[in-house]
Amino acid sequence: MLSLCSSVGLAQSSRQAGVAVKVPFEFVVGNQTFPAGTYKFRSLLNSVAGKDTIDVLEVRSVEGHMYRAIVTDVVGSTEEASHPRVRFTRSGGQVFLSEVWEAGRTAGCRLQKRADLEQTAANEDVTLIASVDWR
């Protein structure tokens, strides 16, 4: 597993929090490719683990030229996330957004794996985690 330290911040708004991340590489969300840049990720439904099974994740570039809302699975933890985390998985030469956790939440958003990316011995699967030490 590779860890990637990146600029990660809590995107505060009057209505909902989110995660702001400077992603230094191209990545895929669903069937859309996003260039390297700074993005805001946030749960639109604020789903609860154990109660809800789906959420909708918003991915938006801070420059305003890229946007995607995608249905995700809800994953849970017994403890609140102490800091925001955005996880990417590299497979078949591409990097895919795989999970987003907002600080203070016990539920995260996990994107469904694409069926056309069947794991084989030839595919290298590496997880890149963008996070920061929150004090």
What role is predicted for each listed range?
Residues 2-10:
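C-terminal segment of classical bacterial N-terminal signal peptides
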Residues 9-29:
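Short acidic, Pro/Gly- and aromatic-enriched capping/linker segments at domain boundaries
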Residues 28-36:
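N-terminal helix-cap/turn-to-beta initiation motif at the start of protein domains
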Residues 35, 46-49:
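Primarily extracytoplasmic ectodomains and periplasmic/lumenal surface modules that are beta-strand-rich
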Residues 37-41:
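A short tyrosine-centered beta-strand micro-motif
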Residues 49-82:
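Mature extracytoplasmic domains of secretory-pathway proteins
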Residues 70-135:
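Beta-strand-rich cores of mature extracytoplasmic or soluble domains
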